[in-house]
Amino acid sequence: MPRYCIVNADDFGYSKGVNYGILEAFQNGVVTSATLMANMPAAEHAARLAKDHPELGVGIHFVLTCGRPLADVPSLVNENGEFPRRGEALVGARRGDIERELCAQLERFFSFGLTPTHIDSHHHVHEHPNVFPVVEQLAERYRLPIRPVRTARPHRLPTVDVFFPDFYGDGLTKDRFISLIDRIGDGQTAEVMCHPAYIDVPLASGSSYCQQRVEELAVLTDPTLVAEMAERGVQLITYREFYKL
């Protein structure tokens, strides 16, 4: 039986360096999909790249722990009007603020002339018990698949069979990537999360995960990787194709 894999690059829109790294991993590597941070400074730049490359599947990367909100959501921000990076505001956040902000991010995504292929989130905040009900409602309204949820209550939203968040950190290699691919069972669809990028000033000043992104990019664009996946009978797809399986 065929096996399918979506290789999704998170943080599209974080900075131009991130955007160009993701594009490189798509054009010359195994990345098939990306998720866009609608509240970040390079979101519009990412959207232009996406429209220029329609084969790249682009979903929405909901953000509640990075940058500034698009809506007036006082229970979600700190004294500087920014989302706290560790997500501590989510515990006491008002449901209405979460709804307003996620709707605002989705509306901005649509304003770019794009339709999201799926939903995931920065730092996996869609798994938070105060956030998931809102995400579930939006996913049902727009009929969008979501990245698998490991901690929220059971749901009926479409999602892949296997999610690999562990192509992340120091010392990543092609063998590490292949070891994940080898865990996809017959007839299953998997998603591998990744964060390729080129380092630029916004990334270096805003993220502690920088050099590792360049290392990820090198692995994801290894010229032998596509062939090795094909030899294993793994087909690269996006969430668009997944929804039709």
Swiss-Prot record:
Entry binding sites for Mg(2+): H61, H122
Keywords, in A-Z order: Carbohydrate metabolism, Hydrolase, Magnesium, Metal-binding
Domain of life of the source: Bacteria
Cofactor(s) this protein cannot do without: Mg(2+)
InterPro entries, sorted: COD_ChbG_bac, Glyco_hydro/deAcase_b/a-brl, YdjC-like
Single Gene Ontology MF annotation: hydrolase activity, acting on carbon-nitrogen (but not peptide) bonds, in linear amides
EC number: 3.5.1.-
Enzyme class: hydrolase
Gene Ontology BP term (one): polysaccharide catabolic process
Family: Belongs to the YdjC deacetylase family.
Annotated function: Probably catalyzes the deacetylation of acetylated carbohydrates an important step in the degradation of oligosaccharides.
PANTHER family: CARBOHYDRATE DEACETYLASE, YDJC DEACETYLASE FAMILY MEMBER
Descriptive protein name: Carbohydrate deacetylase
Lineage, opening ranks: Bacteria, Bacillati, Bacillota, Bacilli, Bacillales
Gene: celC
